[in-house]
Amino acid sequence: EQVALLAYELLDRYALGADGVPDLLALSFSTLDFIGHEYGPHSPESLDVVLRIDRLVGDLLAELDRRFGPDGYVLAFSADHGVTPLPERVGSPFRRVGSEQVRCLQGVERELAARHGQRGWFIDGFTLDPALLAKAGLEAEAVAAEAATLIAACPGVARVLTAAELARGPGEDDPVALAISRSFRPERSPDLFVHWEEGLLPLLGRGTTHATAWQYDRRVPLVVLGPGVVPGRRAEPAATVDLAPTLAALLGVPVPADVAGRPLPVGEPPNGG
């Protein structure tokens, strides 16, 4: 509710939409993320938040219609990620990592210690300890490659990618590596990315997360409303990076040539019908 109240306050305080220059108002209803992580997407708690957001968005649309008319604004609605269902609720093929995976990863640490005479190679997940690398006189890329081979043999691991591999840039024919590379930043990302088998939730205990390149962690809604948009549900593939070029096209704003994504054909009838 506070996010919606902030939207009304911003509309008034900054006179958004009062002239011919497009104004951008971006809202994030992040409560659903916190609830979803704790209780899962199929829980009554998540449903309660979704219904509340639906009401708040409906009220906001009514206010925008009142202020600017139905053709006086463009609106987009999406999410930044999907989510893995709670295995305890939906069952197979979804399952949670357990002692088998933990023991194997602990074995990787022991093997690296046996090879290089040092313990505690990983900090904060799959990031190699730079101080330990310097002490041992080893390069991160070489140790990461060793660790990747060891981790790839663990149960439930589909694939392991190193930071060096991602930095070189995967090809379009490798969709998993391509998806992971879009979340990779050399200065901030770990040295290893573990891609777990489909359905395996890499989280101990309770709750859920979105830490894979599988469709359930990536699929999000993409809704566009406004003048020039033909109503209907479209079946063709789209990506979240298409949203900015689409909004720009609807608003008549030029798009730089190097922007990722493409304007979606929202002005055409869905599926040609």
Language model features with spans:
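Surface-exposed acidic, glycine-flexible loop patches that form ligand/cofactor-binding
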Residues: L11-G20, D65-G69, R182-R185, A213, ...
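His/Asp/Glu-rich, glycine-adjacent segments
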Residues: E1-D23, S30-H37, A152-R159
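Secreted, luminal/periplasmic, and some membrane-associated catalytic domains
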Residues: P44, R55, D59-L200
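Solvent-exposed, polar/charged alpha-helical surfaces in well-ordered, non-transmembrane soluble domains
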Residues: L5-E9, L51, R55-G58, A62, ...
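Structural recognition of the beta-strand scaffold that forms the well-ordered cores
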Residues: D23-S28, V74-F77, V160, F193-H195, ...
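Active-site His/acidic residue clusters
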Residues: A15-I53, D59, V90-G91
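Extracytoplasmic/secreted cell-surface and envelope-processing proteins
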Residues: I35-H37, T84-E88, L203-G205, G232-R234
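Substrate-binding rim/cap in mid-to-C-terminal beta-strand-loop elements of soluble/periplasmic
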Residues: S92, S99-E141, G205, T209-L251, ...
